[in-house]
Amino acid sequence: SQSINYLECHDNRTLYDFLKLNNEENHILDKISLGLAITILTMGTPFIHAGEELLRTKHGFDNSYNLSDDINHIDWYKIPNLTNTLKNLIVIKNKYPHFSYLKKEDINKYLRLEQTSEITSIRYLAKGFPDLQVVISQDYNEYTKYFAPGTKLIFDGNNIVDVTVEKYDFIKPGLYIFKK
């Protein structure tokens, strides 16, 4: 079977508009970044709605198909935006076969899910490649996780990095990738 993974589509409000109701701007960035990461790296076909990475707004209108360009336009120059985060996620998805398993048997064989009340952690295995651990932090509570010696942080929620870590303090929502 196949899946199309998405956070928003042309119907109803944009994710930015929905989150704007109850969140500060920096929290909106963190949450959309987390959502984009899950959408891109989850098995299946990612669908990114036009302007989602640019924090597109339809100014709270649900169905805007019959409204003007003032409502439906994409602000290509909006700062801040998540364009670089999206590019980095696509690089990671293409670099590591861990995120492209197609068969249920492979998913069952090569993925290990660990969940606590603070974070979700998924260990990805791939023959001939280093093990990856994806950690999903879902809130702003601080949580420290310890790692085996030699572990490297390769994605910090927004950027591709290469930092050796023995422990990491998660302080905001995000998807983080570690390599052993």
Sequence positions of predicted segments:
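Alpha-amylase-like alpha-glycosidases and glucanotransferases acting on alpha-linked glucans and related
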Residues: 1-26
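Carbohydrate-interacting/catalytic domains
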Residues: 26-29, 38-48, 52-180
